[in-house]
């Protein structure tokens, strides 16, 4: 495994991380096999945004005795109040779900406390100009989270996040197709975008990446294969699938 520094944190993460959404609803044996295979092959960073207690508890159980070998991105504002993935900016609700995350994972700290799904100007205001940010900063002061991060799919909003000076880590959607899309594209439209919309690297995204480097803000990548479309002969927006 090749390792790289996560911005100004001084932490080193493997170039391949583990996204855990696919483990939701799977039996414990599958979760354990996946987590252990990741650890055994040098993966030391995982993203856990899912709010359900079952998958959180299964991951916590699988990490038992090896928690110190895996850095965790745990998301603040990710909830399942209606039995499906959802977003809440209610501080009390967010606190309850984050405390449940700690309990389910059998840990007293999360490496990266991520403000969840900050895409629009309204999202930014609700997360960064509210008690939500104060809660995250309090967690960091108490050592419950080691660093503050945020996830976004929008380069304009992501730039505001980085310029706030608050975050050490940005989780952002990056792949050869998304990097060519207009900066105000919605996630669903990006995933299904036709190839004729892609005419070169979007300068807004390029500037975001430069800004992160200048500010020492690390980037972890999501949607690297565009939900699998970029490696699919039938669904790729390019003339042939990536290999």
Where does each model-flagged region fall?
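Beta/alpha (TIM)-barrel catalytic core signal, keyed to glycine-rich beta->alpha loops juxtaposed to Asp/Glu
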Residues: 118-243
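A structural motif
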Residues: 40-43, 107-110, 145, 167
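Active-site mouth loops of central-metabolism enzymes
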Residues: 16-29, 79-95, 121-125, 232-239
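Conserved, mostly hydrophobic/aromatic
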Residues: 6, 18, 46, 59, ...
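N-terminal binding-site loop/beta-alpha segment at the start of enzyme catalytic domains
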Residues: 1-74, 135, 141
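Short, acidic/polar
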Residues: 26-38, 89-106, 152-160, 241-242
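Active-site groove signature of glycoside hydrolases
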Residues: 100-124
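Generic structural signal for well-ordered alpha-helices
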Residues: 3, 35, 56-60, 95-102, ...
